[in-house]
Amino acid sequence: MTQLHIAARSVELSALTKRFGRTTAVDGIDLALDGGVVGLLGPNGAGKTTLLRMLATVLAPDAGSLRLLGLDPARPDERLELRRRLGYLPQAPALYGSFTALELVDYVAVLKEHTDRDRRAQECTRVLDLVGLGDRRNSRIRALSGGMRQRVALAAALLGSPDLLVLDEPATGLDPEQRLELRSLLADTATRGTVVLSTHNTAEVAALCQRVVVVTAGSVRFEGTPAELRGLAEGRVWESPIADPRATRSWMTADGAFRNLGDLPAGVAPSPATLDDGYFLAVRSGR
Ligand SMILES: Nc1ncnc2c1ncn2[C@@H]1O[C@H](COP(=O)(O)OP(=O)(O)OP(=O)(O)O)[C@@H](O)[C@H]1O
């Protein structure tokens, strides 16, 4: 008889919940992700960082369960293995200013138990080269620009080619060229594992993500491909010289015309929808 192997998903969340006092930051999220780059979109305070911190095992849920790479982070033995196979870039990484870029990355490598000294040195050099900081490896963190510091933290997250890479607004502070580099770096990582990132930039999602999850008030409002998110707004967008009062939302565009979102009025021709339009609709559906 053929043995049926069902591979563990990279991320499996069931009724995942996290509260801070009276605030429910993550409110019973069910989600299964496996492979590729997944973009997490949502307004300020939606719960993205809280969710990512739980995926990175730095925060434990109050209720519900999560399995990451088939492992249970609540179990100390499984958590250790998981942390070796996980990379995390926090939202505002606190870096020791007096360390050099190399010392900082090496320190994280030690914490991740890369015990072989020579291999650790090679790995640190590799990840610093990957983020384009090979020539600044001996610069002190405090002497680096904001974007370079972000790249040092990214290098630390890439140590050991993680199977699950969790990135909180990774493009913050990067210039356009560095953003392009980041995209190819993450696309490459996603060929071997799963990348989950938060962003406020729908263009980033369109360029990089195979899947997108829209979160508001701690709940998932949409999960699907970027094309499906855009599709939500297809036939629900139109332009006009002044804001149309029939729209649920209107805003002025760069050319001075108004873009309207809502039920298309009779006799009005729809405009092609964008990912932003789909995002606005997904966010509003939760209100
Ligand atoms: N450590 C904490 N203590 C108390 N409240 C918190 C804490 N962390 C988050 N919160 C609250 O939980 C909610 C979700 O916050 P979170 O940082 O996860 O949102 P976010 O989607 O990442 O926001 P942003 O886009 O602004 O980064 C917010 O209401 C926030 O104030």
Where are these regions (language model features)?
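A short, proline-enriched helix->beta-strand linker immediately N-terminal to the Walker B motif
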Residues: L159-D163
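Walker A (P-loop) phosphate-binding loop of ABC-type ATPase nucleotide-binding domains
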Residues: P43-G47
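Conserved ABC transporter NBD signature motif
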Residues: G64-R75, E81-L82
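ABC transporter nucleotide-binding domain
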Residues: L180-N260
